[in-house]
Amino acid sequence: MFTAALSSGLLLPRSAPPLSATPIRMLTEEAALTPAPGESLRVEPLVDEGALVAQGQPLLRLRASPQIVLTAPMAGRLARIELAPGRRLVQAVIFHEGEARHEYPAPAAGPEGLRALMQGAGLWRLLRSRPFGQMPRVGETPAAILVMAADTSPGAPDPMQELRGREDDFGRGMAALASLTGALFLCGAEGLPAPPDTRRIACGRLHPQGLAGMQIHRHCPARIEAPVWDIHAGDVADLGALLVGGLLPETRLVQVSGAALRETRLVRCQPGADLRGLCRDIVKPGPHALLSGSALDGGPAQFLAPRDRQVTVRPLASGPARRHWFAAALRRAGRPLPVIPTAALDQALAGLPAAALVRALGAGDDESAIRLGALSLVEQDLALADYATAAEPPLSAQLRAILDRIEAAEVPA
């Protein structure tokens, strides 16, 4: 039984060239472990620079939580580990070499054994805990887990295509996740196996209906004392494969699109793949920017971010911007600039109380923002609203400022 889909959202214009039909396997010559956007990881190396490593082998562990490790995205040679002050990870770069794979033993029975396996095999960081949108703490217990088998972001690959032929792995992963929580939700994925108590949520084609934050706000709002996790359905299938075979899958399905390309490409590549390698031979002449993520919420990057499954290549302006006195006056005006509530803003927030939420964000009103659903959201969930309003500063940045204040005040260090 499916819960009714959200009815609000926008159908975004397509600016990418046509998609090539069949995914191609493409392991780039370089790959890297990097923090997710906004994430700060204080790490300790487990392997020396220059050493040969197997795909899936633990390379780094968190200093504060040594149970949680980061694993090699491919077999190769660990070229360098770049750390910022405080031993915060910038990137750990690997050059492709060999085909070795690291095998994990079967986990101990029960939820604690599953936690230990996910934390020790690098899958824990693919979970995202709300509020605040970070990796769950080691001992955190979620009130619910939402599995996303739908994605309406512009240029995102269809998660159902990634799951094709992996239905058994997905069902095994879903059964495992059910042991970690009292409520398991599955968004999309009609016909895929899931435990009997799973609540299925229908998802429409409009954006942002396929974002976890909007579904969490509607079906299982996050609270400080009752966190909610979300995870991509492809990562759930990876967990199922790890449980039965002891090996982490080598690739994930990634779509490479954007107006600066001659064609849209669907690839199976390693996590942390080099974006330049994924775009090779299909970039149009001229200056361009590589983004990990969608055109709405992606950021400039050299390597694919940990949770991303799309790459956007957009053209850059080739000359200086035309000057105008009115635009210059607006840039010198006070901040934040007023946001005018419109129908587009209402649709971009998919049923959230748009005017009240924007007012709370602009005023820095933490209590009102909490009451209106901010604890279920992260920056990605407001990216379409930023696009619809051209808000300055962006609504997503205002949301992050409020979340950071709440976290500092309410969550023990």
Regions found by a protein language model. Give the residues of each.
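Surface-exposed strand-loop junctions at beta-sheet edges and helix termini
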Residues: 47-48, 53-54, 59, 73, ...
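Glycine-/proline-rich flexible loop or hinge segments
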Residues: 55-63, 98-101
